[in-house]
Amino acid sequence: MNYAIDKFTGTLILAARATKYAQYVCPVCKKGVNLRKGKVIPPYFAHLPGHGTSDCENFVPGNSIIIETIKTISKRYMDLRLLIPVGSNSREWSLELVLPTCNLCRAKITLDVGGRSQTLDMRSMVKSRQIGAELSVKSYRIVSYSGEPDPKFVTEVERECPGLPSEGAAVFTALGRGASKGFPRAQELRCTETFAFLWRHPVAPDFPDELEIKSLASKQGWNLALVTIPEVPSVESISWLKSFTYLPVVPARTSITAIWPFLNQKTSINHVECVHSDTILLSANMAPTSSENVGPTMYAQGSSLLLSAVGVEKSPAFFILNPGENDFVGVSGSIEQDVNLFFSFYKKNVSVPRKYPSIDLVFTKRNKEKTIVSLHQRRCIEVMMEARMFGHKLEYMSMPSGVEGVARIQRQTESSVIKLVSNDDIAAHDKSMRLLSPVALSQLSDCLANLTCHVEIDFLGLGKIFLPSSSMLSLDDGEFIELSPNLRSRILSFILQMGHTLHGFSLNNDFLLVEKLVDLQPEPHLLPHYRALVKEVKTNGFECNRFR
C-alpha cells in the first residue's frame, strides 16, 4: 500500500515520505504496518506478521513484496483422537481434543468439548496440548478468547472440529499418530489394517463374517470395536463398510517382508540388517503384476549385477534371495519402484544353515522304516494321508529355531488350536533343526490318528497343509482318490472365472478345491457347466451331499 496513518500524529503519510523510525497503521483495518523499501523496490507499507487478514482491501503480507494475488492463509485444525489403554484397562477408553500450538501470549481460550465448557491459559499451548472430550454428536469448538491472544493462532486455527456421527461409525486408525497420543480419525479404510469403530446407532450392526471383530466395553450408549479388514474383502463387505462408515475402502499397501533368517532387524522404514545367509526368504504382499496369469516380478540389485524373478502366486508371492558375497543388496518391484527393501549383512560366529528352512515330519511305519517329508513338498499330502490311514506313527516334527506355527483341529462337535513351537532338543536327521515340544507332539499325533478330525497345519511361508476327515475320503483297496489333471484345471478355471480368490489354496490338495467348488453359487446361465463339473467330480469318487 502507498499510504498509512502515523500512529502518533494521526496524519496520512505517503510511503515515499515516511521514515522507518515512526509507527504506522493501516488506514482501512487499523492494524500495524511497517515501511518496506530497497534499492530496486520503491517504498511501500506492508502489514506486520500476524496482523491483518485478507479481508482488508489494502492487505499486503509483511513477508513478501507487493503482489497482485494474495495467497490464502493455510488453516490448522483441532484433532479429535481416541485413547485406548493397553491391557485390562482397555475398557477405560476415552476421547481427547488435540489443540494446535500457539506463540507465547497472555490470553485465555474457552472451548466447548461436547457440552462441557473448559477454559485454558494459552501460555500452556506453546507445546502440544490435549484435553479430555465428551462423547457428542455436536461439534467441538472454540467459544471465545480473552486477553491478547496470538493473532496467528486466531487467524489460522479453524474454530470447529466435527463431532461423532449420529448414524454409522466414526473410524480411528493407529497409523499416522505422530508424537501425540491416541488414534486419529481415519480418512479411508485400507485392507489388512485394523481400525477402531465408534458408533451409537444401530446398536447391534450386522458385521460381515469375513471381518475380524474385537468388541470393547460400551460407554454412555456408545459402542467400540476393533475391526480388521481382510486383504481382499468381498464386494458385499466393501459395500457394507462404505454405508456404515461413509469412508472409501482402498487396497492394502504393497510391502516386501523378510521371513528368513529370523536374525534380522529393521533399522529404518526400508532397511534391514540381517545375519549373512545363503538363503533369504522374502514375501511380496499385494505387489503389482504385469499380467493376470503370473505373479509379480522382483528385482535384486547387488554390487555389480541386477537379477529378476517372477513369483508363482500373486499375493503373498515368495522369493528366495542368495546374496552371494554381497554385503548390501536392494530388492524392489518391477512396476512400483517406490516399494523397496535394502539388506545389509553381517557375519555371525555360529554356523548358519545352508539348506532351505523347512518343517520336517518323520513317520515310522509298522516295519520300523522311517519316512521324512517336508511340509512344503508336493508329496507331503500323500505321505500324511497314507500315515493316517495305515496308522503310521508321527515320530517327531522338526523346525528351525524360533519358528512358530499352529494346528487347527475341527472335530464333529468342537474345534481347537494347538500351538506348534520348538524346544531346545536337536533333531536326529539335521543338527540345525529343533524338535517340536513333547506336549504339542502328543496332541498332534492323537489328532492325526483320529480319522474323524479335520487337521490343518499352518507355518505361513514355510508350509501349510489340510487333511480332511475320513468322511470326506473314498478309499478303494488303500488307494487315494484324486482329480485328473485335466479336471483339476477345468475346476480351477471355472472358480477363477467367477471372480473368486483362492487364499491358502494348494494345487496338491484336491479336497480343498472340491470344497471351494461346492461353496459356489453360480448364475443360472452357468448351471449346466457347473452340473457337468459336479458329475465328473462324483465320478472320480468324491462324495458330498451339498452338490446340486
From Swiss-Prot:
Keyword ATP-binding: no
Protein name as it appears in the record: Druantia protein DruB
Function: Component of antiviral defense system Druantia type I, composed of DruA, DruB, DruC, DruD and DruE. Expression of Druantia in E.coli (strain MG1655) confers resistance to phage lambda, SECphi18, SECphi27 and T4.
GO (cellular component) term, any one: cytoplasm
Organism, scientific name: Escherichia coli (strain UMEA 4076-1)
Family matches, as Pfam families: CoiA_N
Protein keywords: Antiviral defense, Cytoplasm
UniProt key word DNA-binding: no
Reported consequences of knocking out the gene: When this gene is missing the Druantia system does not confer resistance to SECphi27 in E.coli.
Main location as per UniProt: cytoplasm
GO BP, one annotated term: defense response to virus
Superkingdom field: Bacteria
Protein location: Cytoplasm
